[in-house]
A protein has these predicted regions:
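N-terminal amphipathic/basic-hydrophobic helices that include classical n-h-c signal peptides
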Residues: 1-18
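Cytosolic catalytic domains that perform sulfur/thiol-centered chemistry
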Residues: 13-301
């Protein structure tokens, strides 16, 4: 393991303060801007231009926010013909990166993006996977903050390294072989977070093969939020997920999508609805189709 030098002059707040683990509103974040025990991440990203949103970040962001790039910071190296489009990084490398960004054991992390929260959810899930639970996604994200004319900044912060213990959550990540076995197991539910059209095998614009993993059920992550970008009521989300799970224990379900992004949004919505943690297939559809021997289905579930 590595060590990160503990800063001597950084004063941290009372660790007994409320811990936010799923969602947080703009008013609460505004009240904590500048607090040493709060770290903000801007996760805006464009799948068609990996650098576009970082340029937007430099043009203006929530004060104190650190930019986290999906491809560079939250994904590992792509292995052509083997991995998905956004594979998970090595956990120790990812842990080191977060520590260098100033995350300590009692630090509250807030994450936002410019869309429904899928990229922010990837960082949210990643931190929880490493064992840090004090992380929440900003309700409505960048659009909600701007719509209220709240403060903006062009200053790029210089975080002071800190350290939280690495406690990797065993069993949260599954591989393609596990998914293959699950596809024929009635006690396991595969949930696909992509749009319903891509699930059916229509309008596939990101991956060279269309369709879905046999046995999966479609639950588009966009259905977790309303037109205003706010998450649906927790009880409504709970009923929706119970319908898709259809008696399957939530711990036994596996979430996937195109490359392990919108699946994290579904996992966030499940947590918001009061469910325990499910499992993630991070390689998702883009990894599944790299092996022509793996079965493919099309049409509705």
């Amino acid at each position: 393991m590595f060590s990160v030098e503990q800063p001597r002059l950084l004063v941290h707040l009372d660790s007994t303060l409320t811990m936010h683990q799923t969602l947080i509103d703009c008013e609460t974040l505004l009240a904590h801007l500048g607090h040493s025990d709060w770290v903000i991440f801007d996760c805006r990203f464009d799948l068609s231009d990996a650098d576009a949103k970082e340029r937007d970040y430099r043009a203006g962001h929530i004060p104190g926010a650190i930019y986290a790039n999906l491809s560079r910071d939250l994904s590992g190296p792509v292995i052509p013909g083997k991995s998905g489009r956004n594979p998970l990084p090595d956990p120790e490398s990812l842990h080191r990166r977060f520590c260098n960004w100033g995350i300590g054991p009692k630090v509250q992390v807030v994450v936002y993006d410019s869309g429904p929260g899928s990229f922010a959810a990837r960082l949210w899930w990643s931190l929880r996977w490493l064992g840090h639970e004090r992380v929440a996604v900003l309700e409505g994200g960048w659009k909600a903050w701007n719509s209220q004319n709240l403060p903006l900044s062009t200053e790029v912060p210089k975080p002071v390294p800190w350290r939280f213990p690495l406690q990797l959550q065993e069993g949260w990540v599954v591989d393609a072989e596990t998914v293959l076995q699950a596809s024929t197991n009635p006690e396991v539910r595969l949930i696909d977070g992509r749009g319903a059209d891509r699930f059916r095998g229509e309008n596939e614009t990101l991956d060279p093969v269309a369709g879905h993993i046999p046995g999966a059920r479609s639950l588009p992550s966009l259905s977790n939020v309303g037109k205003d970008g706010q998450f649906q009521d927790a009880e409504e989300l709970r009923k929706k997920f119970e319908g898709v799970l259809a008696g399957c224990a939530v711990e036994q379900h596996i979430s996937y999508c195109g490359s392990g992004i919108t699946a994290c949004h579904n996992l966030l919505a499940m947590k918001h609805a009061g469910f325990a943690a499910g499992r993630l297939y991070p390689g998702s559809w883009s990894e599944w189709i790299t092996d022509p021997k793996r079965p493919i289905a099309t049409g509705a579930a």
